[in-house]
Amino acid sequence: MANLGLPYLSIEFREQGIARIERSKRSVVALVLQDPEVSGEFQLFSLSDIPKGLTDKNKAQITLAFMGYVHTPRKIELVVEQSDNADKPKFDVTSPGFVYLESVRWDYLAVPFADAEDTLEIATWVKSLNTTKRKMCKFVAANVKGDNKKIINFTNKTMRDLTGKEYGTAEYTSRIAGLIAGTPPQISCTYAPLPELAYVEPISM
């Protein structure tokens, strides 16, 4: 009779293992934006969760992130900082939004409107999170030297979608973060198709 409790434990461990496998198939994207009207931290599980009042430019970034690949991202940890200069945003890793990201789980970060200076600062911050905070996270950065496996360096200069809209390197990091987050661990995203694009400027080798 003493062994009656063992099957329950076996089922519980098995269920936990299945849950971990399912989570690994769909990672979490962290996305940091600035907006003239909206501010706060939001957990998005689908496009229907996009906060009201965001600019069309910011909504487009969330849409890009949710495109994913085999799967969509499990969720997006969205940080929106209110700024009167949202058209030319500046980001500070000591701001409340970035402090919030230190306290929640996410896998891939994109800050699509960060300039070169802020991108370097954010890259340093992400490296620090992995070493001092023991977080398992990566930063999809635009044109940052790939000197650390926690930094994913995206360098394509110009992308044009089927409607004719063009994206610069940094603007498209949301799409890349979502694509990687939606890639199951048993396959590679190296040759993942981007069906929304009509043109990608070739990289000079």
Language model feature labels by segment:
Residues I21-V38:
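A short, compositionally biased N-terminal segment around positions ~18-40 that is enriched
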Residues M1-R26:
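Short, intrinsically disordered N-terminal pre-domain segments
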Residues V32-D35, P89, Y100-M205:
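A glycine- and small-residue-enriched flexible loop/hinge signal that marks low-structured segments
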Residues M1, E81-S83, A116, T158:
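Interface-prone segments of viral and bacterial extracellular assemblies
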Residues S24-S27, K75, K135-F139:
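Positively charged, low-complexity intrinsically disordered regions
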Residues D35-V111, T119:
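An N-terminal, globular interaction/scaffold subdomain
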